[in-house]
Amino acid sequence: MGVGIALGGWPGVVFTKGGIHSPYEQKTPYRQEKKEIEPFSELSLYVGSEADVVVMASKDEKYYVEYTLDGNYGKPKCELTNGKLSIAQQDHNGYMTGMFGLNLGENLSGEKSYITVYIPKGTLLETADIYNDYGNVNWSNVNGKKVSIEADSGNVKIEQSETTSMKLTLNDGDAFADKLKAETFTLQSDYGDSTLSNVSGKTFTVQSECGGVKTEQSETTSMELILNDGDVSVDGLKAETFVLQSEYGDSTISDVSGKVFTVQSECGEVELDRVLFEKMKVEALDGDVLSSEISCSFADVTLEYGDLRWDAQKLENLTCQAECGDVDLILPEELEKYEVDLQIEYGDLSLPKDTPHDQYREEDGEVSYRISASEKNAGKKISVINEEGDVKVRYR
């Protein structure tokens, strides 16, 4: 609106690829009533205007297409050749209507703009390639071997789908996947929250630049979450390999199990609850690591600035290096059943009352406690090195 005023014209003047125009010019929308079409195995949708895109299961065993698209953009091209359905609307005549606060998916007349493609339930598409410039994308009850969905400004929702490979790319919008089964799933999000619920399969990767990531009640071979700025919530996950890399944000992980568990957090609190893995590695640069009911054979924990509470329901080997913060170890059995090496440069050491203190040493402010390897503690070891902070050992 400010553009028109600055140019000395009427408010609402906008720049487009075709020049300077008024958004109040309205062309008749392009319409295609719901129409049955021939079967197809490949799908290509390109929407350069404002519209919602829906790909969903039909109620019968037939294929259909329908749309209403903004007449101020280029004329849509709809083709079905050699088993491939292609629908495209370029923005040759398009106005930047999103700058004026219009609702997502509405054209200048206020009428809802959309494309809906219907596919028989259970059909497996070979490929699906979808791009939507400004609007939501909903993929529901449709299967595909190779699926790629890109939304520049809008939400993407996946429901009850099976796929060999699925890639979601979002610039500005939320992503949601429910009851998705995939061999390979990749989600790249610039701005927006991402939610995975009841997903299953092999390799799942989520990369989020700015926005939270939530997963719940899922089972995969591997799950990798990479975040720049946003909180993480993982609840109910079975994965052979779990990897979390977080730069800024809190992480809450509960009811997860598998073989290899890795968390790297640069700035934020890490909460672990009911975690069962064979090997665990946790690195926190700035933030507390607070845990309860942890079961693992090998644990490697590194902290720079923050406290550690490690509540072990099962523990065979633990290595902990802390730079500045308190360490609280809650062990499942007596300290004497481990080979022990505790070292504190500046801080106090607190041990259970019944622990033999003959290996306790204090010299020049440094505190150490050791229990040598023996048949009694064969194969089990606890090593803690803390530069500045207290160390407390207690039992569950």
Predicted regions and their residues:
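Short, surface-exposed interaction patches in beta-rich subdomains
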Residues: 159-161, 166, 175-189, 193-396
